[in-house]
Amino acid sequence: MKFNLTHFAAASAFVALAGSAAAQTEIKIGYALAPDSHYGVAAQKFEEVVLAETGDQFSFKHFPSSGLGGEREVIEGLQLGTIEATIVSSGTLANFVPATGVFDIPFLFSGLDHARAVLDGPIGQEILGEFDTVGLHGLAWGEQGFRHITNNRNAIHTPADVEGLKIRTMENPVHLAAFDAMGAAPTPMAWPEVISSLQQGVIDGQENPLSVIVSVKLNEVQKYLTLSGHVYSPAMLLVSKPFWDGLDDDQKAAM
């Protein structure tokens, strides 16, 4: 009798453990930059905060350095519900929520304080809310800074120095139109292809905030840096709408 009770207790414990493990939800979070980048640090902090608030209800799996694909592919994964979260540059988001394209207008903001006030105010929060209509949920804006130009062809001192420059941009209509108006040759390209394209001379340069330029060591493949500050480029913490809709109120509050 004791033998049977012992095995029954063991079996019951196994079932309880299996049920607990099954109840834990995995959050896959993908981003374009390295684990030690500002994206990686932010993703780790997001995990720490969520786990501190929810205990063992969630587990996190990080996919840095475009481990789940380019930014557009990852966002589409969020819409499908196959990826739970991402930290992404706002420049990609105009393809999904056109209103975000307003932030890509060159020289729109006078400085960081101006940009942050708009993003944290009614305009920024209203745009965050629009993501719910396209299978996404915007949790928060994040800091990246102003975008600057790097290239291998020549130093840039005047607008004429940009003439004909093959510069990688995101697949963003405002970015493309702006560089086209300057006389450059804007080339939309997914981020995972950029470094090799610079090395092979497919493109002359690219433009990004200093946080990205430093993180990916563009100084190793580019000769010139121009502190143009032509566009303020916020990041965004996004989650999948199907994932978000499956959370209870306490879990949503933790995020």
Model regions and ranges:
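N-terminal secretory/targeting leader peptides
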Residues: 10, 24-114, 122-254
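Bacterial N-terminal signal peptides that target proteins for export
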Residues: 1-9
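Sec/Tat signal peptide C-region and signal peptidase I cleavage site
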Residues: 17-23
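Expand to "…catalyze enediolate/carbanion chemistry for C-C bond making/breaking, isomerization
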Residues: 14
